[in-house]
């Protein structure tokens, strides 16, 4: 993986492998009436979707986890906006914000819910959907745009103990 505007290496996980299988399943659902695969998205009821303060990301040296996420505001553009796309209230009225929830992670820092790619099923790293800006690119407490992180696991138990990494090493798996 390469490094760009984020503090960590870029997440090399490629979603296209699962996309092909999902498109085949969707085609079977549409053409043959076959049941679609069950949903695997994070959910509040099973605690795989949590408030950012409840995120159990491992404490890793030189890895700063996000403490805030982009906030989505509830806005009102007028009565005709939803049905006709006509803006009659400009600027729009802000009516609060939506709750910010994030996917919960396992002991390696990989998301619990979702379609597990082979790299995540048998991990050699922590793969995140976020990467904070590095000092040369922006405020280091903010999420960089469209960048995930790749944080390699320690190779050996000795490496893990030397770096005080709480994740099991590759050797220990």
Regions inferred by a protein language model and the residue ranges of each:
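C-terminal His-loop and adjacent cap/lid subdomain of alpha/beta-hydrolase
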Residues: 1-173
